[in-house]
Swiss-Prot record:
A Pfam family matched in the record: IF3_C
GO molecular function, one term: translation initiation factor activity
GO terms for biological process, alphabetical: ribosome disassembly
NCBIfam families from the UniProt entry: infC
Name assigned to this protein: Translation initiation factor IF-3
Family indicated by similarity: Belongs to the IF-3 family.
GO cellular component terms, semicolon-separated: cytosol; membrane
Underlying gene: infC
Bilayer-crossing regions: none
Length: 181
């Protein structure tokens, strides 16, 4: 562990740019993607500074030679952030919703819970149906299976079963996902 003063800030993970590249010899690629060959880090930094650009570590070759590129680091970082934001926009996030029922649930209550599950499925959420066994009700596993099957029949027009009912402790869990149109 590192010795640090209590009042000092934690050291940020620094990108391998310019002086922060930990190598004496580097393979340099210029801004036009031309290979300039292996040279000392100092020489490479001078070339980059003469063009008002930065020396950025791209990777390491199997023999240990550090591959660097002469780029505008601020612009590179901005482009990377832009790409990651764009990727996040197009990412679909599936939300998980849970509905709890019991073995001896009434018919109307089951229909009400199924109606709510249909709403969740129409929104595009994944629904976990948990049937809770209280006390010694676990011995009526077949009754629990039947209740979950009845529940699934009520929502089968908008959802499909992702995972079959499985006993997990005192819960019998089943997962339903929306049907693709």
């Amino acid at each position: 562990m590192e010795n640090r003063n209590r009042n000092s800030r934690p050291i940020k993970n620094q990108d391998p740019v310019n002086e922060f590249i930990r190598a004496h010899q580097v393979l340099v690629i210029d801004e036009d993607k031309q290979n300039l060959g292996v040279m000392s880090k100092r020489q490479a930094l001078e070339i980059a500074r003469s063009k008002n650009l930065d020396l950025y570590q791209v990777g390491v070759q199997p023999d240990g030679t550090v591959i660097t590129r002469i780029v505008n680091f601020g612009k590179l970082k901005y482009e990377q952030q832009k790409k990651s934001k764009e990727a996040k926009k197009h990412q679909t996030k599936i939300e998980n919703k849970e509905i709890r029922i019991t073995v001896n649930i009434g018919k109307h209550d089951l229909e009400t819970k199924a109606r709510k599950a249909k709403e969740f499925l129409e929104e595009g959420s994944r629904v976990k149906v948990s049937l809770k066994f209280r006390g010694r009700e676990v011995v009526y596993l077949d009754l629990g299976q039947q209740t979950l099957n009845n529940f699934f029949e009520l929502v089968s027009d908008v959802g499909k079963m992702e995972k079959e009912a499985k006993l997990n402790g005192k819960f019998l869990d089943m997962y339903i996902v929306p049907k693709k149109n």
